[in-house]
Amino acid sequence: MILIISSLLDRHARVVAHALARRGVPAFIGDVMEFGAGARLSARNGDLHWSRADGATANIAQTRAVWCRRNFTPNFDPAMSDPCDREFARRQWTEFLWGSVYALDVALVNDPYLQQAATKTLQLSEARKIGLRVPDTLITNQASAVLDFVERHRGRVIHKTLGTAMDQTLFTKRWDGRDAEALNCLDLAPMIFQEQVRGHREVRVTVVGEAIFAAEFDTCGKIDGRADVDAPYRVHDLPQEVVDRLQALMTRLGLAYATVDLRIDGEGDYLFLELNPQGQFLYVEIKTGLPITEAMADLLIGEDSEAHRSAHRMPADPPAALLAAPRGDTSRWSAGSRLAS
């Protein structure tokens, strides 16, 4: 059995579960949105039973791999209004869930600890180290530094957050002169500021174990391609040099799955923008026909042989931030060298 930690409302979870079922491999979607709202979990003597609100039940101890598809926000009863109580309950759920997952000692896609470690600050640093081009980047909460940065790039600057705002999608935005008026709020929390890359071609890369799928689209002047769901996508043939460096980045970060955003500048060079260990791929698959779902099923059931050969090993020469990873199958999956077309 494959455990998919997500939500029953998540199309990605349902589609991959269906692909696994077609192969005769059962999958159980553990709905983390039901924590505090109908889910029942019990661990005893090596068994872990998970019951969903719809009555479906599974013994998670029989799991052969876990896809940590989505983080969770417990759906607590509004009557639990005290912030301290809610935070205490959230921590209880967090320890129970991830402690139980690590105790399984099976392949994790991706290890939840490593997913958290793959922050924008770390991934930008690691991308530079392995030779990927990265736009000039400033991460700061200092207004004067931002103004100097904007002046240096003659106003051609974009800005984005380091993380998400709960369940909201926060898009990357182009610097506007009026943004200077809001810099007094920057003291509260840092943000990312980058030079705006010239060029209108963006490549969405999906890495699944050894396989790499790339799709190109025209941004049509938009700063954040995610804002245009109707943009036409076409299969893109990445240069082998870029493929090798993306694989190296995945290995250094200890990730088996991620989506990567690249921008092609006016000279045809590829620039690394960001990586998402839980990025979406269905819209790319639907528009291009790339078999990403099948690749994910292969990875989870173990047909990605190179990934299995890397079981129980930390990434080669990992960044220091990953060396404190907790015990468990923290690096069973690593990227290899096959380019899927």
Model-identified regions with their sequence ranges:
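Extreme N-terminal starter segment of soluble prokaryotic enzymes
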Residues: 1-3
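Peripheral (often C-terminal) accessory segments that flank ATP-dependent C-N-forming ligase machineries
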Residues: 304-341
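Conserved N-proximal alpha/beta basic substrate-recognition cap immediately N-terminal to
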Residues: 7-23, 28-133
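Loop-centered beta-sheet repeat module
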Residues: 122-168
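A short beta-strand motif that forms the metal-chelation/ATP-contact edge
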Residues: 205-207, 268-283
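Phosphate-binding site of ATP-dependent enzymes
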Residues: 20, 151-245
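A long amphipathic alpha-helix within ATP-dependent nucleotide-binding catalytic cores
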Residues: 187, 195, 207, 223-270, ...
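Short acidic-glycine loop/turn motifs at beta-strand connectors
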Residues: 44-45, 53-54, 207-211, 265-268
